[in-house]
């Protein structure tokens, strides 16, 4: 089984060797689970039990799944993950730090697993970083080759590098590109985290902040100006708000709004520099961009990103930059 744990939901799937999902379950994560590792582990365990029950019901296997003597569960989470120890070192999205999540989930399932017919081989729970799972799935069944740079751009920005089909782990810290400091395009001389400038939610917030600031100036408001350093936390925006705000931002660009264009272009500039530096370090490997917020029209996002990257790499071979084929399902399928 693969399980993806986000701030909003737990998604669990069973997939076959071709990556096709056989059965799936999705459960919302209550707000009180944030920063409560034991409660979160219970929610993950509940999703796993529901998926197993659903699978056996679908196949009419009331006595258990024949031939299945062990259950192996891969769990993906955002943040810094020590995969060898099964520990979340730090996850802002989940509010966890130094949390042995794999062990907690295993404990939440131990009594249930002992009663599952035929499960003599026991239960194994493994923990993975979400972008690494997405990269591996895209390499196996999606748009990437065995060597790739996987870039997830949504509420946050994270990445993973696969070399020879194997994720580069970096003691759990590999892929935390969203935390890199870049020049803040909204405040001269200041710096901000990449994901507070160039994630989709950050660009929505920057555009909204610009409109509010213009409104305050127009009406002589004494409201406080936003602080430099980008968005305090791009993930404060919910996914529906980001999606709605993205439509507004793209609509403003199409209507000729210069501020909206500046926000979009400066975000793409930062992403292009990241990709170009990756190419300089690793060579022209596949670059796969996965974003639930990416508009269907590649002309707004991927095409200008490709042009910027091609310009920045100079006389180096430009990478093959493509949209993820598996979309939002890549992470849980990889797990």
Regions found by a protein language model. Give the residues of each.
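Internal alpha/beta domain cores that form substrate/cofactor-binding pockets in large enzymes
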Residues: 261-282, 287-335
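Short glycine-rich, Thr/Ser-proximal phosphate-binding strand/loop in the N-terminal lobe
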Residues: 3-46, 87-90, 171-174, 178-185
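Glycine-rich phosphate-binding loop of actin/hexokinase-like ATP-binding domains
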Residues: 145-201
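Short, acidic, Ser/Thr-enriched surface-loop or helix-capping motifs
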Residues: 16, 83, 162
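A mobile "lid/hinge" subdomain adjacent to the ATP/sugar-phosphate binding pocket shared
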Residues: 187, 191-288, 294
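Short glycine-aspartate micro-motif
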Residues: 1-4, 70-74, 147-152, 158
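Glycine-rich phosphate-binding loop and adjoining helix at the ATP-binding site
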Residues: 32-45, 49, 53, 66-73, ...
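Glycine-rich beta-strand-to-loop/alpha-helix junction loops that act as flexible
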Residues: 71-79, 153, 285-296
């Amino acid at each position: 089984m693969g399980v993806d744990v986000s701030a909003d939901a737990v998604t669990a799937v069973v997939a076959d060797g071709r990556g096709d999902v056989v059965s799936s379950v999705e459960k919302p994560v209550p707000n009180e689970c944030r920063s409560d590792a034991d409660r979160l582990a219970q929610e993950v365990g509940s999703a796993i039990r529901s998926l197993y029950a659903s699978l056996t019901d679908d196949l009419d296997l009331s006595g258990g799944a024949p031939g299945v003597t062990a259950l192996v569960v891969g769990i993906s989470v955002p943040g810094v993950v020590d995969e060898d120890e099964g520990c979340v070192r730090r996850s802002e999205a989940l509010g966890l730090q130094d949390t042995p999540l794999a062990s907690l989930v295993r404990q939440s399932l131990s009594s249930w697993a002992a009663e599952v017919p035929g499960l003599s081989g026991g239960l194994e729970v493994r923990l993975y970083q979400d972008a690494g799972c997405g990269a591996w799935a895209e390499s196996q069944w999606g748009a990437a080759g065995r060597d790739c740079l996987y870039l997830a751009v949504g509420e946050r920005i994270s990445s993973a590098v696969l070399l020879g089909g194997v994720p580069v782990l970096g003691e759990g810290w590999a892929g935390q590109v969203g935390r890199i400091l870049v020049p803040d395009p909204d405040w001269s001389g200041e710096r901000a985290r990449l994901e507070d400038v160039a994630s989709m939610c950050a660009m929505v917030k920057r555009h909204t902040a610009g409109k509010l600031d213009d409104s305050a100036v127009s009406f002589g408001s004494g409201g406080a100006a936003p602080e430099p350093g980008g968005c305090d936390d791009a993930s404060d925006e919910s996914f529906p708000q980001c999606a709605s705000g993205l439509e507004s931002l793209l609509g403003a660009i199409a209507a000729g709004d210069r501020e909206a264009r500046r926000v979009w272009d400066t975000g793409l500039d930062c992403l292009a520099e990241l990709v170009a530096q990756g190419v300089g370090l690793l060579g022209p490997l596949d670059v796969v961009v996965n974003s639930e917020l990416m508009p269907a029209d590649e002309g707004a996002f991927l095409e200008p990103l490709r042009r910027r990257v091609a310009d920045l790499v100079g006389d180096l071979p430009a990478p093959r930059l493509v949209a993820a084929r598996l979309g939002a399902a890549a992470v849980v399928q990889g797990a």
